[in-house]
Amino acid sequence: MAEQTELKYDIYQPFGPSVLKTTLPRSFINLLNAEADRILHDEKLSKEHDWSHNLAGNVKKEVAIDQNKIPNFPEFMITMAKQYYKHTIEKDPIEGSKVGFRVWVVSQYAGDFNPMHIHDANLSGVAFLKIPPGFDAEYAKEDHHPTAGCLEFLGSIPNHFARHSYIAKPQVGDFYLFPSWLTHQVYPFRSEGERRSLAFNIHFTMDKPIKGVNV
């Protein structure tokens, strides 16, 4: 009988973008929803904070919010951005850089959608704050390639052994971070109620270039 030897191997992913996923602490979810409610439920404030003219979405409301009104949230976004770069390029282009944010809330209802688009920044992110009560049942009913209300990231050209898309089913608290140039879209849904998400861009300018880093 041939001698059994333990196979040792590594699998590398040298090409294509990475997507970071984590869970938003409940304290942030509550504070972000409270600030979103304050603006969304007031027609005057909704108009003052309207951000839809800068966005691709076909949705009920998209309103800008001030991240500094959420204690420690800017620091949380920076921490996640640092972790993303630590994993992808093993360097920290944010340290010592000038960092800016643009944060907004997307309030969607049945039939709303967001077509394929990219963002103008360094990193972008999405966090889910609310989903309709009947969303899970609607998703489960779609027995073939369920996508109702889902976020989809689109990468390379379809090919053997190369995944070209990733579909993220919304769950309250899920937080995604990705390169701003990564194409993504949001599918419509039919359930009654609000699908609410937080979207943001992180911009930074390096005072001193880092060798091998192009961001």
Task: Show the residue positions of the predicted features.
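Non-heme Fe(II)/2-oxoglutarate
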Residues: 2-93, 111-114
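A short coil-to-beta-strand element that immediately follows conserved catalytic motifs
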Residues: 90-102
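Catalytic core of non-heme Fe(II) oxygenases with the double-stranded beta-helix
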Residues: 101-177, 187, 194, 204, ...
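Short, charged beta-turn/beta-strand-edge "cap" motif at the junction between a beta-strand
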Residues: 182-185
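A domain-level signal for the structural core that forms small-molecule/cofactor-binding pockets
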Residues: 197
